[in-house]
Swiss-Prot record:
Signal peptide: none annotated. It comes from the Bacteria. Belongs to the UPF0235 family. Gene3D superfamilies: YggU-like (3.30.1200.10). This is UPF0235 protein GbCGDNIH1_0277. The lineage of its organism: Bacteria, Pseudomonadati, Pseudomonadota, Alphaproteobacteria, Acetobacterales. It holds the Pfam family DUF167. InterPro entries: DUF167, YggU-like_sf. NCBIfam families: DUF167 family protein.
Length: 107
């Protein structure tokens, strides 16, 4: 089962967010609360008033090389498991996500 899925004009991406992390970065897959694989993303921002969500969006935008305005949170506003939509070429985005899932980056 993949952590991403092609949709019209983009992809959806399943995430597992770790707020207030000591080591920030993204990469690798971990099981979510539902047992399905998700891309792990660790941010230093707290899960308070959307700060972690904003940090996640900024980190994803940089890693996927898209403007942050092209990333939309679909599910998980207050949860660690999130589903986001990323607008862009599904093939290019999917390839980048696969690279992140297999290795990842640390900031």
């Amino acid at each position: 089962m993949s952590i991403w899925r092609s949709v019209e004009n983009g992809i959806t991406l399943a995430l597992r967010v770790v707020p207030k992390a000591r080591k920030i970065g993204l990469g690798g897959t971990v099981p979510g609360a539902d047992g399905k694989p998700r891309l792990k993303i660790s941010v230093s921002a707290p899960a308070d008033k959307g700060q972690a969500n904003e940090a996640v969006r900024d980190m994803l935008a940089k890693a996927l090389r898209v403007p942050a305005s092209r990333i939309t949170l679909l599910q998980g506003l207050t949860a660690r498991d999130k589903l986001v939509r990323v607008e862009g070429d599904p093939e290019t985005l999917g390839s980048t996500v696969e690279t992140l899932a297999s290795g990842g980056t640390d900031s």
